[in-house]
Design a protein with these regions (language model features):
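A glycine- and small-aliphatic-rich helix-loop capping segment at beta-alpha/alpha-beta transitions
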Residues: 21-28, 112-126, 176-179, 199-212, ...
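ACP-dependent fatty acid/polyketide chain-elongation machinery
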Residues: 1-66, 243-255, 350-364, 408-412
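Conserved beta-ketoacyl condensing-enzyme motif
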Residues: 7, 23, 28-161, 190-199, ...
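Active-site-proximal alpha-helical scaffold in enzymes
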Residues: 77-90, 139-143, 147-191, 229-250, ...
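Acyl-CoA/ACP chain-elongation machinery
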Residues: 181-226, 259-273, 303-310, 327-377
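Condensing-enzyme catalytic core mediating Claisen C-C bond formation in acyl metabolism
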Residues: 4-8, 35, 213-289, 298, ...
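Glycine-/small-residue-rich "gating" segment that lines the acyl/pantetheine channel
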Residues: 124-130, 171, 175, 191-247, ...
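Phosphate/pyrophosphate-binding loops at sites that engage ATP/ADP/AMP, CoA/4′-phosphopantetheine
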Residues: 84-96, 245-249, 282-298, 320-324
Length: 412
């Protein structure tokens, strides 16, 4: 019999706030984190906007010497993980470190580090490359650094499934606890790829919005959408086996109820046009949660603001929920924080938890004219206040990776 898994801690570094409190205040107020790019000179680029993390000072959130040996994606993960761990109230003096794991995904890792050192290699020769380039840039170092900083000696892995990385990480952590491999797991996603090659690459792929207006560049499910806005940051949760959490008197935010993961086997960047792959992930998550489609109160969609994703994801929701797809409330957090890539799914699970807690579904800002081809019940224009017992979070990644996670209101 699978063990029950609950959420006891949360942490976030995002374009609208560098703590859970700041982030959620921004979400509730409909704040946008999209602004002109400042990380580099983008004057010659077609894309001028990004959702950058602001006012983040690594040495204020972690050991200064350790921070110097981390790229931003690792720093964001460590900061968010420390917040989540403290929020959970875990005391390592009372815990078996081999029963606490770390599963943190990143879709890209240290792209900027690779970029800068390649430039050094070309201009100044191989002797000038940073000797720490490899451990700085490889994507598993977010999990590695969190494990080191918190002293966690259980299973430690990095899930890389593009923009589904954070969601898969939480799902895999859920499984590890359900089947007894761990009692606690620090899980989520992180990303920091707002750099020249990152923006140029996504632009060449025609994935990014070229809209110069920060207020309307990210407008998921809008008929005039033209691409996503690249974002960055980290979202981390502490997952815990229910009896372990109860035994130490932990505050329980919500329960992990379902996890579905599928592959489209269709295209390297586009979701399956009929939505069957993502739809099946939702069906699998509902099956594990033991619920019917009409019991899903809220869907936090992948909702990237690209033509293909929003249309095909809407089809996937219809595929999975049938008639219930017409009434379930759907939104996209990416309208506020842009597409945080490997961190997106984890941050959006946090939104689901906070939405259950506050009985509040944020609006999808920037979206004004719903695409009739998408045509579902998107929260646009104003937030929705309603009791939420089951919230679903969808994540889709290049390569055909589909993940659906269901979070439920905790009850004994």
């Amino acid at each position: 019999m699978k063990r029950r898994v609950v959420i006891t801690g949360m942490g976030a570094v995002t374009p609208i706030g560098n703590t859970i409190e700041e982030f959620w205040d921004g979400i509730r107020s409909g704040k946008s984190g999209i602004d002109p790019i400042t990380h580099f000179d983008a004057s010659e680029y077609k894309v001028k906007l990004a959702a950058e993390v602001k006012n983040f000072v690594a040495k204020e959130r972690m050991d200064f010497k350790a921070a110097k040996r981390m790229e931003s994606f690792s720093q964001y993960a460590v900061a968010a993980a420390k917040e989540a761990f403290e929020d959970a109230g875990l005391d390592m003096a009372e815990e078996d470190p081999y029963r606490i794991g770390t599963i943190i995904g990143s879709g890209i890792g240290g792209l900027e580090c690779h970029e800068k050192n390649y430039k050094k290699l070309q201009e100044r020769g191989p002797g000038r490359v940073n000797p720490l380039m490899i451990p700085l840039m490889i994507s598993n170092m977010a999990a590695g650094n969190v494990s080191i900083q918190l002293g966690l000696k259980g299973k430690c892995t990095d899930v890389v499934t593009a923009c589904a990385s954070g969601a898969n990480s939480i799902g895999d952590a859920m499984r590890a606890i359900q089947y007894g491999d761990l009692d606690v797991c620090v899980a989520g996603g992180t990303e920091a790829s707002i750099c020249p090659s990152g923006v140029a690459g996504f632009t060449a792929l025609t994935a990014l919005s070229c809209n110069p207006d920060p207020a309307s560049a990210s407008r998921p499910f809008d008929k005039d959408r033209d691409g996503f806005v690249i974002g960055e940051g980290a979202g981390i949760v502490v997952l815990e086996e229910l009896e372990h959490a109860k035994a130490r008197g932990a505050r329980i935010y919500a329960e992990m109820a379902g996890y579905g993961s599928t592959g489209d086997a269709y295209h390297i960047t586009s979701p399956a046009e009929d939505g069957s792959g993502a739809g099946m992930a939702m069906k699998l998550a509902m099956k594990e949660a033991g619920i019917q489609p009409e019991q899903v109160d809220y869907i936090n969609a992948h909702g990237t603001s690209t033509h293909h994703n929003d249309l095909f994801e809407s089809r996937a929701i219809r595929y999975a929920l049938g008639k219930a797809a017409e009434t379930v409330v759907i939104n996209s957090t990416k309208s506020m924080v842009g597409h945080m890539l490997g961190a997106a799914g984890a941050v959006e699970v946090i939104v689901c938890v906070k939405s259950i807690e506050d009985q509040f579904i944020h609006q999808t800002i920037g979206t004004e004219h719903i695409d009739p081809e998408c045509g579902l019940n998107y929260a646009v224009g104003s937030p929705v206040e309603k009791k939420i017992d089951y919230a679903m979070s969808n994540s889709l990644g290049f390569g055909g990776h589909n993940v659906s996670l269901i979070v439920k209101r905790y009850e004994e």
